[in-house]
Design a protein with these regions (language model features):
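A domain-level signal for the mature, folded cores of soluble proteins
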Residues: 41-195
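A periodicity- and composition-biased signal for non-globular, repetitive helical segments
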Residues: 11, 27-28, 219
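Short amphipathic alpha-helical surface micro-motifs
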Residues: 26-27, 57
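N-terminal secretory signal peptides that target proteins for export/translocation
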Residues: 1-18
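C-terminal membrane-anchoring or membrane-association module
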Residues: 211-220
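Short, threonine-centered small-residue motifs that mark membrane-proximal processing/anchoring sites
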Residues: 16-26, 32-44, 184-212
Length: 220
């Protein structure tokens, strides 16, 4: 039977009064809801669920900005062909699989040794009818795109991932979803697809807030 890992303030922190327990719970809730968040060297976007919708008679695009600056990548859906592609901006790169964007599973290593390119890469082709016909990403698939914010040959380049979900059908009105992303703020450092900040920093922050309040109460 799995051990209950919830934080029981009544048992582990007997000196914390009800007001302080409420403060700790509030601090944890605020910390967990903060977007983006950072712990260690990983910077995480939080859940985004940005959408790219196929539009009849015109091409649709979605700008993706990983670090709060300029656009880093552009996801496009061409209605005339049904092709979904990603392009890199400002010499940023994507992890490729030949002419396509490689779909990575959770835990896959992304870093300086990854095959990468600044070229436009295709994810999938749904054709004019909206039926998936080809691509490195299959219909209805969720996966991770490996990316880098800069040249693959630079030791200062941050590596990261973008989680993307493709629709089961590619008819007009269907949507591609960019679920979330993260990157290593330390240049040249590899990251695992799907890696996010751990909760330890949030717990420490909350406990610190409780301790500060307790010290102030005793001093009053």
């Amino acid at each position: 039977m799995e051990r209950d890992r919830r934080l029981d303030l009544g048992d582990t922190h007997p000196a914390v009064d009800p007001t302080e327990r409420r403060l700790l719970a509030y601090a944890l809730a605020v910390g967990a809801a903060s977007v983006p968040s950072a712990h260690g060297a990983i910077v995480y976007s939080g859940v985004q669920n940005l959408t790219l919708t196929r539009t009849a008679g015109s091409d649709a695009s979605l700008n993706i900005d990983l670090d709060g600056g300029a656009t880093d990548f552009v996801l496009k859906w061409y209605d005339s062909t049904g092709i979904i592609q990603i392009s890199s901006e400002s010499q940023n790169i994507v992890v490729n699989d030949g002419s396509g964007l490689r779909r990575l599973s959770a835990g896959a290593l992304i870093g300086p040794g990854s095959p990468s390119s600044t070229d436009v890469k295709e994810l999938a082709n749904y054709g004019v009818s909206g039926t998936w016909t080809s691509g490195t990403w299959t219909a209805g698939a969720t996966g991770y795109a490996g990316v880098a914010l800069g040249s693959s040959g630079s030791s200062s380049t941050p590596w990261g991932w973008i989680q993307i979900t493709l629709p089961a059908s590619g008819t007009v009105g269907s949507q591609v979803v960019v679920n979330s992303w993260a990157y290593e703020s330390t240049g040249g450092t590899s990251i695992n697809a799907g890696a996010v900040p751990g909760p330890g920093a949030l717990v420490s922050l909350a406990l610190g807030a409780v301790g500060l309040r307790a010290r102030r109460s005793r001093a009053a």
